[in-house]
Regions:
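Extended low-complexity intrinsically disordered regions
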Residues: 1-63
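An amphipathic alpha-helical micro-motif enriched in hydrophobic residues
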Residues: 46-57, 66-95
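Conserved small/polar residues in nucleotide/adenosyl-binding loops
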Residues: 102-104
Length: 104
């Protein structure tokens, strides 16, 4: 499946768990009009990702409960999925291609 934009993902009928997750992220982008409010600006999105990585790092280094670490990881995953929507990249295919390149 090639990369889809927000509207395509919102209209898409998911056929597996990955597509269901992507649709949920796209619906969040659509609900808050990220595309129309600079939320798809990659400089801004990368800054958010760095901030979330910092929060994950702090949770780990301060010995926070695993639930808090998991929440920060989920934030990062949602952001990465959103990056792929903003850039119209098929993240699942890119993931699979990368794993095949490193022979997994």
């Amino acid at each position: 499946m090639e990369g889809l934009n927000v509207e395509d993902w919102v209209a898409h009928e998911p056929s597996n768990e990955w597509e269901t997750m992507m649709k949920k992220v796209a619906k969040f982008h659509h609900k808050h009009d990220f595309a129309g409010k600079n939320g798809h600006d990659m400089g801004y999105r990368i800054a958010l990702t760095v901030e979330e990585l910092g929060e994950l790092s702090a949770a780990i280094t301060k010995g926070k409960p695993l639930e808090e670490c998991a929440e920060e990881m989920a934030d990062i995953m949602i952001l990465l999925m959103g990056h792929s929507i903003a850039m119209e990249i098929d993240l699942k295919s890119a993931f699979e291609k990368k794993l095949s390149l490193i022979h997994i």
